[in-house]
């Protein structure tokens, strides 16, 4: 999120709200202790932890941030079932991504309940919540529309802008004004060029505020290869495989405040 701040010598401030630590298993390459060093190096004063579907690292993250004098924001990038968490039909029941951040203790308890239910009741390839659970446990949480795998970007990519708009309004009405944000990302992907203008249009039409993030899976640009190796281990491939799963650019790192302003301000 980009905000003006008197405390920044350049009048700039930025907080990363979309971060994957090593607890996004075989995907995130941000070691928590090193992440705090990187945040301080960037002159940033707060950081969120939003691992994929889990809260394994929250306690370690919280303690490390406090020790470093950085404000910790507990969160999770949850998987939302395309139908319900009980529907588990091959090639039909997938998931979309959604960022949830804790505002307070109530939010933390509700996020823990959501993640637990995702494993106990909704697990199908991934631990999944559904909209019924979100309706039950949304209090105390801030919600961001997530990356290209989010429900709203996916609707845009499928050419259904009205569905994207309806989904955004549903989340806005559920979480309440000021607690739901359209998430803007730009990693230099072809899909970003399609989705970004439509997300901005949607936000302006609905009055839903926007939050700029970077889907950070590693600390620095030069760490992209390390994260690519993790993906190979996850998928049983090698770096030599032409069709291996990989991120298409090396922009998925913890960017400096100036880099984020250059992208979005």
Residues covered by each model-derived region:
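Phosphodiester-processing cores and adjacent nucleic acid-binding clamps
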Residues: 1-265
